[in-house]
A protein has these predicted regions:
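A structured binding-face within diverse protein domains that lines the active/interaction site
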Residues: 1-142
């Protein structure tokens, strides 16, 4: 599924930030919010597919490509989502793009353009959909 989607069904997943959880000692994890220092939205490299759902309905699914972490993200997790620089988005979406060239786009985004900060554990529940989920509880890491 992923190989075909990588070749033929690439997309951008637009966001203004994302969460990642840092493992602590034991089973606890600390949530972090990561965003561009500029605060502007960005595009993740994504792939999509249509699957047959129940009763012959079609179910659209997508996944965000990941890569090894940059210096900032390595402090939090062992991988990170692929954030495409603005000048490479069209190339990612180009149906004629060469597969090896596309693989070359799956690299860590520059650390110096990102910030990460600890947020409340409110984010751990999907029932909590408020600005409190992205408010810093500690100063930003950069």
């Amino acid at each position: 599924m992923f190989r075909d989607a990588f070749r033929r069904h690439r997309c951008l997943v637009v966001a203004d930030g994302f969460y990642e959880w840092k493992k602590n000692h034991g089973r606890s994890r600390t949530p972090f919010f990561i965003r561009l220092k500029s605060g502007r939205p960005f595009g993740f490299a994504g792939i999509w597919s249509l699957k047959r759902g129940e009763k012959a309905t079609r179910l659209a699914t997508c996944a965000i490509a990941t890569c090894s972490p940059n210096e900032l993200m390595a402090k939090i997790h062992n991988r990170m989502p692929v954030i495409l620089p603005a000048d490479l988005r069209d190339r990612w979406l180009d149906p004629a793009a060469d597969e090896s060239e596309l693989r070359g786009l799956l690299v860590p985004f520059p650390s110096q353009e990102l910030e990460a900060y600890e947020v409340s554990k409110l984010v751990n529940s999907p029932r909590n959909d408020s600005p409190d989920c992205v408010r810093p509880v500690m100063a930003a890491m950069d």
